[in-house]
Amino acid sequence: MFPPEDFSPATSPLKENPMQLIGMLDSPYVRRAAISLQLLGLPFEHQSISVFSTFDRFREINPLVKAPSLICDDGTVLMDSILITQYAEAFPQKKRSLLPTDLGELQRALRIIGLAMTACEKSVQIVYEHKLRPAEKLHEPWLERVSGQLLEAYKALEEEFTKRPRAVTSATIDQATLTTAVAWYFSRQLVADVVPAERYPALAALSAAAEKLPEFAAAPYGDGICQAH
């Protein structure tokens, strides 16, 4: 979570060689990385390449075909939005950190991020179970288990943001709030019947406010290109 001692702007000439974020914005992982990079003030270019419809093209960039992938200025390819945002936090030229420095607040933020990332994961598993598995092979016990995990994640997040509402502005939003907003919007697009908005008013309000921010608007959910704000 912290910059290495030998890390300096001289080792990362971002203005000359901006980083390349690879993946589609219908992925919550790609989207949270794109929004995070904007809020950190780090220049990057986005390539909307699908791990499904353009598999071969993605494989040319990263043989593992994992989104998001980040091509660093020296050509190194990083994967996983958690690791990409951790790397981005290490740049000294960033505008600000999206993570608190106080240990207790950091613990709370990481818990929220973990809940939101789990919500993303379980939403994806539900979609895959319905859309990729043949109907006659649908495994109801597994689907019930995954749905239960999703509901527990959002129950905990709703309680957290009801108890401690956050200011949602470009200058104040943190990684925990950002990730929760991205996760909720994603789940509502794909599994709205599992997580009805009326049961989660705090999360619905948080998402609505976040989607109005320029950094979110510049990276809209879907198959478009992030126009970095």
Task: Please give the residue ranges for each predicted region.
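GST-like domain detector, emphasizing the conserved glutathione-binding G-site
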Residues: 2-140
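Long hydrophobic alpha-helical segments typical of transmembrane helices together
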Residues: 197-229
